[in-house]
């Protein structure tokens, strides 16, 4: 048990927050959440279609249960409108305009885009 805690702490300290969460060691272990069921303040994985670009670093994702703002900054949006994607990241806890802070985007062709810069 102490080794697990040490490893998780080290992963977190090195900026691998997604890897620091038990149960999220790889993409296959991450449960898919419907956009309408996303809870604030949690790590989530959602899938949908890019509905529209909101800014150079933000887009709206849509599934059959709703829409969600996805923030990729300070990176450029690496997807296109109409593209089916899966996004893993942190859902902030803002009451007004909550956003999913993307850490990883998987495109329909299987390409994984890891967003290496953290958010400010």
Model-derived regions, located:
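Bacterial N-terminal signal peptides that target proteins for export
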Residues: 1-9
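OB-fold and OB-like single-stranded nucleic-acid-recognition modules
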Residues: 4, 15-120
């Amino acid at each position: 048990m102490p080794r697990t805690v040490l490893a998780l702490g080290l992963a977190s300290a090195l900026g691998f927050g997604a890897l620091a969460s038990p149960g999220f060691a790889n993409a296959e272990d991450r449960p898919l959440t419907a956009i309408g069921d996303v809870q604030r303040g949690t790590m989530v994985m959602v899938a949908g279609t890019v509905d529209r670009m909101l800014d150079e670093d933000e887009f709206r994702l849509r599934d059959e249960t709703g829409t969600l703002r996805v923030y990729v900054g300070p990176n450029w949006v690496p997807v296109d409108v109409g593209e089916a994607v899966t996004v893993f990241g942190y859902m902030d806890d803002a009451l007004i305009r909550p956003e999913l802070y993307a850490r990883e985007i998987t495109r329909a062709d299987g390409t994984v885009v890891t967003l290496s810069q953290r958010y400010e």
